[in-house]
Amino acid sequence: MKKTLKLQTRLTIFVCIVVLIALLITFFTVGAQTTKRIRDQEKATALQTAEMVAEAPMTAAALESGKKQKELQSYTKRVQKITGTEFVVVMDMNGIRKTHPDPSKIGKKFRGGDESEVLKGHVHISTASGTLGKSQRAFVPVYAENGKQVGAVAVGITVNEIDEVISHSLRPLYFIICVSIFVGVIGAVIVARTVKNIMYGLEPYEIATLLEERSAMLESTKEGILAVDEHGKIKLANAEAKRLFVKMGINTNPIDQDVDDILPKSRLKKVIETKKPLQDRDVRINGLELVFNEVPIQLKGQTVGAIATFRDKTEVKHLAEQLSGVKMYANALRAQSHEFMNKLHVILGLVQLKEYDDLGDYIKDIAIQQKSETSEIINDVKSSVLAGFLLGKQSFIREQGANLDIECNGVIPNAADPSVIHELITIIGNLINNGLDAVADMPKKQITMSMRFHNSILDIEITDTGAGMSEEDQAKVFEQGYSTKGKNRGFGLYFTQQSIENLKGQMILTSEKNEGTTFSIRIPYEPKEENHD
């Protein structure tokens, strides 16, 4: 696997390169401008010096008369020293030097070949090589009082001297560039570390992986997820949330919309203000019942938004009913197993005691009892799932010290829709459990259940000999979480009512103090067509 540089290293290198490029551009730009400025200044100095010497009366007089050569030599040396030029040469119309920094060169022809223009009366500047090396020269003609040209002045500054001046002028820039590079490297490291900290120390590929995992989780979850910023604007809605929006009749794109415009019953803004979560809140929107959980999003102690998770309440209820049904199956099987083990222990004891006559009588009693209990249920209840559940429930109730009588007034056919059986198990199981709780402290612990099927209607009646319920309890008994038996109770009858509503049935509660309670249920029930080949 190819090893890649870490983000901090890459950022440091990148920022350093950017800083270096910027500094190099600055250096070359400033350097070029400085070089041009110095060269222009040197040209101006040479030209001004040449003009000053050419206009001096002594120069024209010496060239015209051929006298005062020493005075002219002394004058040009003073000018050369004052102006800092390399040489000041006065020549006649034949190009013969009259002055020169090196006296041995006086009287000889001017070297360079660029003096011809000035001898024709033209002022010009050029670069050429002479006895003192390559230099930048300014040429100015000398005129007598009568206006006749009598010679010329050449003032030069060597290229080496100009380069030295340029180099000296650029030295501070070299220092500034080096310091800037050093500061840039430190700044790059600081920027890279800051960015790394902002990204919680994660590398780009790690962030990409987290985003992919987050997206996969959001889109695969069965709950709608909605995230808003601190202003209540929707910033995220997963696929399930959008599906539920469609079921609510909301077909607009929720992103960047105000949450109150999309979900008027949302409490996300309140959650942001109070910084307190709201959990398991029942909400009905456009006929769709939802279970909402809303929590604030906090970052470094600041609330930066909120998240809502919501699900179709009917789906949640269906899951709860399935879990309730499984639990009932397990309890029934456990009770039946426990009862049979007790009977086997009795049989084993009678065998060991060799009480074979008593053993025979005991087995006959068990057979008669089992036949009387099971024959009606097995013969009349055609759904094996429901029949097995009822038999197991009888054993469980008996194990708890109570008695459950089940009467079938005619045949109860199997349901055409298997989900109806699961709903019935939820209804019957919860009502029998409620009856068991009611008779727990009563001297007579009797629960009676009857079923009757007629004209696609299933009637169920469950009666207990408990203490009964007051009118106040009867009014609240089907509310979620309401119970007279303490905390973490009050869900059985609530789910029972929901299951009956799902089946489009109805339930009547009749209860009197010290007389017991009766639940009467009527449910539409389509029988399954049986094949009789």
Swiss-Prot record:
<keyword id="KW-0472">Membrane</keyword>
<feature type="topological domain" description="Cytoplasmic">
    <location>
        <begin position="196"/>
        <end position="533"/>
    </location>
</feature>
<feature type="topological domain" description="Extracellular">
    <location>
        <begin position="33"/>
        <end position="172"/>
    </location>
</feature>
<dbReference type="GO" id="GO:0000155">
    <property type="term" value="F:phosphorelay sensor kinase activity"/>
</dbReference>
<comment type="function">
    <text>Member of a two-component regulatory system MalK/MalR. Involved in the activation of maeA, maeN and yflS in presence of malate. Probably activates MalR by phosphorylation.</text>
</comment>
<dbReference type="Pfam" id="PF17203">
    <property type="entry name" value="sCache_3_2"/>
</dbReference>
<protein>
    <recommendedName>
        <fullName>Sensor histidine kinase MalK</fullName>
        <ecNumber>2.7.13.3</ecNumber>
    </recommendedName>
</protein>
<dbReference type="InterPro" id="IPR000014">
    <property type="entry name" value="PAS"/>
</dbReference>
<feature type="transmembrane region" description="Helical">
    <location>
        <begin position="173"/>
        <end position="195"/>
    </location>
</feature>
<dbReference type="Pfam" id="PF14689">
    <property type="entry name" value="SPOB_a"/>
</dbReference>
<dbReference type="InterPro" id="IPR053609">
    <property type="entry name" value="Histidine_kinase_MalK-like"/>
</dbReference>
<dbReference type="InterPro" id="IPR005467">
    <property type="entry name" value="His_kinase_dom"/>
</dbReference>
<dbReference type="InterPro" id="IPR036890">
    <property type="entry name" value="HATPase_C_sf"/>
</dbReference>
<dbReference type="GO" id="GO:0005524">
    <property type="term" value="F:ATP binding"/>
</dbReference>
<dbReference type="InterPro" id="IPR016120">
    <property type="entry name" value="Sig_transdc_His_kin_SpoOB"/>
</dbReference>
<feature type="domain" description="Histidine kinase">
    <location>
        <begin position="335"/>
        <end position="527"/>
    </location>
</feature>
<keyword id="KW-0547">Nucleotide-binding</keyword>
<keyword id="KW-0418">Kinase</keyword>
<dbReference type="InterPro" id="IPR039506">
    <property type="entry name" value="SPOB_a"/>
</dbReference>
<dbReference type="GO" id="GO:0006355">
    <property type="term" value="P:regulation of DNA-templated transcription"/>
</dbReference>
<keyword id="KW-0067">ATP-binding</keyword>
<keyword id="KW-0812">Transmembrane</keyword>
<dbReference type="InterPro" id="IPR013767">
    <property type="entry name" value="PAS_fold"/>
</dbReference>
<keyword id="KW-0808">Transferase</keyword>
<feature type="domain" description="PAS">
    <location>
        <begin position="210"/>
        <end position="281"/>
    </location>
</feature>
<keyword id="KW-0597">Phosphoprotein</keyword>
<feature type="topological domain" description="Cytoplasmic">
    <location>
        <begin position="1"/>
        <end position="9"/>
    </location>
</feature>
<keyword id="KW-1133">Transmembrane helix</keyword>
<dbReference type="InterPro" id="IPR004358">
    <property type="entry name" value="Sig_transdc_His_kin-like_C"/>
</dbReference>
<dbReference type="GO" id="GO:0005886">
    <property type="term" value="C:plasma membrane"/>
</dbReference>
<dbReference type="Pfam" id="PF02518">
    <property type="entry name" value="HATPase_c"/>
</dbReference>
<keyword id="KW-1003">Cell membrane</keyword>
<dbReference type="InterPro" id="IPR029151">
    <property type="entry name" value="Sensor-like_sf"/>
</dbReference>
<feature type="transmembrane region" description="Helical">
    <location>
        <begin position="10"/>
        <end position="32"/>
    </location>
</feature>
<feature type="modified residue" description="Phosphohistidine; by autocatalysis">
    <location>
        <position position="338"/>
    </location>
</feature>
<dbReference type="Pfam" id="PF00989">
    <property type="entry name" value="PAS"/>
</dbReference>
<keyword id="KW-0902">Two-component regulatory system</keyword>
<dbReference type="InterPro" id="IPR033463">
    <property type="entry name" value="sCache_3"/>
</dbReference>
